[in-house]
Amino acid sequence: MSKLGVVLFVFLLLLPLAAPQPVGDQPADQPADRNAEARGTYLYPFSYYRLWRYFTRFLHKQPYYYVHI
């Protein structure tokens, strides 16, 4: 095995295996915990109608953004 092969083997395979694993309470996990309540909310069918009504009213008030389908 060449020297380059040994270096690649050590750095690409052995070093990641020996690295400490991250703990569960990392700062990167916090936004997912904060958004758990937002993901848990359920939009009822009437809610979609209300959102569509508000959206169309907004488009009618802003004629430059209005796209007629």
UniProtKB/Swiss-Prot annotation:
Signal sequence interval, chain numbering: 1-20
Location(s), subcellular: Secreted
Note: The mature peptide does not contain cysteine residues. Negative results: does not inhibit Kv1.2/KCNA2 (IC(50) is >30 uM), Kv1.3/KCNA3 (IC(50) is >50 uM), Kv1.4/KCNA4 (IC(50) is >50 uM), Kv1.5/KCNA5 (IC(50) is >50 uM). Also seems to be ineffective on Kv1.1/KCNA2, Kv2.1/KCNB1, Kv3.4/KCNC4, and Nav1.2/SCN2A.
Name assigned to this protein: Conopeptide Y-Fe1
Tissue expression as described in the entry: Expressed by the venom duct.
Keyword hit for Manganese: no
Family: Belongs to the conotoxin M superfamily. Conopeptide Y family.
Family annotation (InterPro entries): Conotoxin
Keyword Electron transport set for record: no
Keywords in alphabetical order: Ion channel impairing toxin, Neurotoxin, Potassium channel impairing toxin, Secreted, Signal, Toxin, Voltage-gated potassium channel impairing toxin
Gene Ontology cellular-component annotations: extracellular region
Role description: Tyrosine-rich conopeptide that specifically targets voltage-gated potassium channel Kv1.6/KCNA6 (IC(50) is 8.8 uM) that is expressed in Xenopus oocytes. In vivo, causes seizures (at 5 nmol) and death (20 nmol) when intracranially injected into mice, and causes paralysis (at 10 pmol) to C.elegans.
Domain of life the protein comes from: Eukaryota
Residue ranges the record assigns to the propeptide: 21-69
Single GO MF descriptor: potassium channel regulator activity
